[in-house]
Amino acid sequence: MDQFFEHLNAGEREAAVALMADNAEMRIHVGDNSQLLRGVERVGGWFLRADKGLKMIPADIRDTGSTYECDVLVVRPGVNSQHLDATFRVEAGRITAINLAPR
């Protein structure tokens, strides 16, 4: 996961997406709703299309082996920063699931 955040925060989005499994899933919670993206094309595309300058800074990391939980500070130019609860599942060295929810 350290590599994922390093690549993402350095603007190397393609390298960050390359760490995802082909069958990756991402659930994004907004208000009372959530959206589920399936497949590396959709999940990776979300990161590739994000605002230029997007940074995701992890803190309060809890790494339990296959699950990586953290508080993520999301910073985007021109927008207020936001804290998210983030959970990542990693299997065989690939990110297979991401869950992002506002704190």
Please annotate each region the language model reported.
Residues M1-E12:
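Short, aromatic-enriched amphipathic alpha-helices that serve as compact interaction elements
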Residues E12-R27:
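Short, well-ordered alpha-helical segments enriched in acidic and aromatic residues
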Residues M20, T64, E91-A92:
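Structural motif
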Residues M20, V74-R76, P102:
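Short beta-strand segments enriched in hydrophobic/aromatic residues
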Residues E25-Q35:
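A short gly/proline-enriched turn/hairpin at secondary-structure junctions
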Residues M26, I61-D63, L100:
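Hydrophobic/anchoring residues in structured secondary elements
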Residues R38-D85:
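Surface-exposed, charged secondary-structure patches
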Residues E69, S81-R103:
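Short beta-strand edge/turn micro-motifs at domain boundaries
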